[in-house]
């Protein structure tokens, strides 16, 4: 369900490249939705999911470019250590902090899965691609912000 907007929003896709092929699929899904919606977007890459919220915060403070919303894309696969919980929990918490405390429109497409098979099931085009869902969510949140008076 592509959002119909009365404005031409500009979004930033922040993509973690830790799992390159999975990231490619998530990005393709997000880009497809944004292109079909007729909005403009930029893409930046970061090393991993933990860096996504910081990149969004940096972009938000930049006064030379304005983004109406953000799409966070990445993949965290459980390993043998506690690192999975740290990355999954803290990247999600930091995105929620940005959403709630700074009122940013963010679509979260960071996969947090048990194994690579689950990641592919959520990243492949034409299936349950979470990149498209994240882009749709960002567009929806931009529309809600406009509805409730954010006229930037």
Curated annotation (Swiss-Prot):
Gene Ontology biological process terms, A to Z: riboflavin biosynthetic process
Biochemical pathway: Cofactor biosynthesis; riboflavin biosynthesis; riboflavin from 2-hydroxy-3-oxobutyl phosphate and 5-amino-6-(D-ribitylamino)uracil: step 1/2
EC number: 2.5.1.78
Ligand binding ((2S)-2-hydroxy-3-oxobutyl phosphate): 80-81, 122
GO molecular function: 6,7-dimethyl-8-ribityllumazine synthase activity
Listed Gene3D superfamilies: Lumazine/riboflavin synthase
Endpoints of the signal sequence: none
Entry binding sites for 5-amino-6-(D-ribitylamino)uracil: 18, 49-51, 75-77, 108
Active site: 83 (proton donor)
SUPFAM superfamilies: Lumazine synthase
InterPro entries referenced in this protein's UniProt entry, alphabetically: LS, LS/RS, LS/RS_sf
Keywords attached to this entry: Riboflavin biosynthesis, Transferase
Entry superkingdom: Bacteria
GO CC annotations on file: cytosol; riboflavin synthase complex
Catalytic activity: (2S)-2-hydroxy-3-oxobutyl phosphate + 5-amino-6-(D-ribitylamino)uracil = 6,7-dimethyl-8-(1-D-ribityl)lumazine + phosphate + 2 H2O + H(+)
Protein task: Catalyzes the formation of 6,7-dimethyl-8-ribityllumazine by condensation of 5-amino-6-(D-ribitylamino)uracil with 3,4-dihydroxy-2-butanone 4-phosphate. This is the penultimate step in the biosynthesis of riboflavin.
UniProt record similarity statement: Belongs to the DMRL synthase family.
NCBIfam families: lumazine-synth, PRK00061.2-2
HAMAP family to which the protein is assigned, alphabetical: Lumazine_synth
Protein name: 6,7-dimethyl-8-ribityllumazine synthase
Organism from which the protein derives: Bartonella bacilliformis (strain ATCC 35685 / KC583 / Herrer 020/F12,63)
Recorded name of the encoding gene: ribH
